[in-house]
Amino acid sequence: MHHVTKVHFGPLLSEVRTKIDSKRPILRYLVDRREGLKNTHPKELLVSDFSCLHSPFSLPDIDLAISLLLNFAKSNKKILLYGDRDSDGVSSTCLLAFFLRSHQAFSDANLEVMVSSESDPYGLCKEAITKIKKSKPDLLVTLDFGSSQADEIDLLTKEGIQVIVLDHHEVPVRIPKNCALVNPRRIDSNYPEKKICTAVLSFKLVSAILFRLSSEWNQLYSKTNTDENGKNEILYFLNGIKYSKGQLDSIQDQNNKNSLDVSNPLPYPEDFTTNVPLDDERKLFYYQCQKIPSFFEQLEEETDLAGIGTITDMMPLIGENRHFVKLALESLTKLYIGDKKRKGLKELLKELKLNPNGITTKDLGWSIGPVVNAAGRMGKTEEAVSLLLSETESEAKTRAKLLLSINEERRERTKRNMDRVERYFARKPERTTHEVVYCYEPDMEPGVSGIVATRMVDSYKKPAIFIAPDNGDARGSIRSYGPENVLTLLESLSEYFLHFGGHPEAGGFSIAIDQIPKFEAALNEKAKLWLNEDNDRPKEHLIETDFTVLPEEVGDKLLKEWKDLEPFGQGNPDIKLGIQNAKAIHLTPLSGGKHVRFHIVGSGSLKFMIWNKGEEFQTFMSKEGSFDLVGSLEENFYQGRTSLQFIVEWFGKSGT
């Protein structure tokens, strides 16, 4: 909190309510100001509906992937699903495995499921190749990696192994050939959403298979459009994708002209209505899907893992991702209180003691996701997979308890590493003045480098790198602070790495121990160049509130409007409220003073919480009569009861 340079307080909430003529003034105000929501119809923000999802058939190579899966299953050939160890990799692998095991079209499939180990380098490394060859699959499906590993895929195809890659990571100039590469980031991808996780890609593949097996597959529709000059144009729709006549002819030429009848298309269903305004493609695809018996019923349960992957892989909660998360929350709530097929996931919800009246985005990001991720971090990814694929209630209960114990081990390891980090910077305070905060010690423990790097960013308000020894080498994580692209920095230092990769916001690498001093020596100069070239990097740490409120305005009425904009996360941050000239009363230290709970004059019974800065706040309050604060509302479920509380992100002198 003491690192904040500037706080900008937004408009008075009361003035916004007065000026905006709408039943939902908060929604209308924020939609117009949040970049990721600007082009979304407000009605679409309020629903969780399959109609808002795009057709999967604009994903590159999706048709080839379906054909390979169907043909290899029908021939009783071995299919190996190989997923990454993180939550998205586990979620995507289990989602697809569940479907393939349960659908009759794959009843003859010889299916094996495998996930990478914490000790393995990322992706199709030497160790992974060895495991794959030992398994002897006819068809390999990689989940959450593979886009940048053309050489390794060439090697596998020469061994007679066909490959499908489901991945959402950055795609290099040279992409793998001889395989079905389903990645929305491909330069030739026409899919409207680029930032979707691999669990969503698994969902898309499942929905595409169900559609492919229906009578609606390759059913052509047409519509006549008249432009402003009165000229008519016939548009064609195939499997949810719009084509001109020329594009349709090209498709026929590329395939077999006899495989697609264009002579008698069905008319576009102009009279068909949906809950929200949709573009022609989504509207027609939804219309077709509704005609398929049990289509949405089969897909409903698949949304849970798609939502978990979306949240835990920190995808932007705009566009289609919003709908996946909202659908997942509904599905998980039904799973919790009902008798659904995912016994393992249900037992995990029960062990976590979540609110049975409604699973929340916070539950996905702070409870479910970390537990699934912990297995991979602690070198026990297979335990998370075994839980999610549990077939009996007794097995599920045992595995859920085991996974929670693994997560507790992860917490203890993280705490030990953070204690070492604090001692490290106490000895070497100059390290915190560099452009990138960096920490490596030989006694650091592996598996939690991403968590530690994130906490370093939170503490020092700078990009951070944390490295720990791992199986004879070392592995590191880098996290961004602002909009800077950390992959650019890693690329400039790539000569020191064994492997590296990731996203613009978060990356990872492996490095030989003897290369670490050379890496350290080069890091500062490379970081200076990197940040000097990054014009988007903030020059100061700024907190901006969406609204300034009076204490008496913060309550259940505001919470109801607040929920219109959920789910909150990347791309759609929680609504920040500012309160000025607040007066704190009834201070209650918690956990030996580490945290603090209090009320403020005028807010009634609403509890205000400050985490990890309890002593600092109490010292501050001993000198100040009133103060300004910034934070967000939160519903807290504890011991069977739900209460509203205000989580304080920042506090400071009034008027600062």
Residue spans for each PLM region:
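Hydrophobic, small-residue-rich alpha-helical packing segments that form membrane-like cores
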Residues: 98-101, 109-165, 170-198
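OB-fold single-stranded nucleic acid-binding module
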Residues: 515-520, 626-656
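Hydrophobic helix-and-loop "lid/oligomerization" segment in the mid-to-C-terminal part
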Residues: 8-139, 159-160, 211-243, 249, ...
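Beta-strand/loop nucleic-acid-binding surfaces
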Residues: 604-620
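Beta-strand elements of well-folded, non-transmembrane domains
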Residues: 547-551, 566, 633-635, 652
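Short, acidic/hydrophobic/Gly-rich beta-strand patch recurrent on exposed beta strands
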Residues: 439, 597-602, 609, 646-649
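Long, low-complexity segments enriched in small/aliphatic residues
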Residues: 550-600
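Conserved phosphate-handling catalytic cores of large alpha/beta enzymes
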Residues: 142, 164-166, 170-216, 291-315, ...
